[in-house]
Amino acid sequence: MSEKANDWRALAASEDTSAYGPQRIVCLTEEPTEWLYLLGEERRIVGISGYTVRPPRAREEKPKVSAFLSAKIDKIVELRPDCVIGFSDLQADIASQLVRLGLQVTIFNQRSVAEIFSMMYQLAAMVGQEARGLALMQAMQNRLLAISQAAATLKRRPRVYFEEWYDPHISGIAWVSEVLGIAGGDDCFPELAAKA
């Protein structure tokens, strides 16, 4: 938190809700980075995943401090984040190390389209951008609805195999299966997506 945020009296007197949220964020995965840029809150980001591709300028502007399963713990600590944001049990060891070093860590575990929107809202709220976040999310939901309606007119639904990774084989991801359905396709392995 900023110095202002550490002074509860200043917060109580302020109408600026963004001061309550984290001011120095490290994003261990790509999604929070892209979302914070869309919210116009990129100034808060002090470190990103090396896998970040959107927006392209993030790779030029922000130091890369993590892969998906590993992180440069010393570099993250040097950046003095007041919040580190990660994803799923796969980053639990990273989160545990950072918590033991006294850092605030928020791990999301979004697995479905609804959970992705929930994560997006929570992150928008963390940085005082609930209204902007809701507006962006509504536009995205309207696009998904339009795609779904257009897909409903297709004469046939193609069966789709989606492989996220080849070694080990990773398939059957719930949100991917949902998106395939929205777009008019059927996941080849819906039973795997149901377990994800």
What are the functions of these language-model segments?
Residues 1-196:
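N-terminal ligand-binding lobe of clamshell/alpha-beta domains
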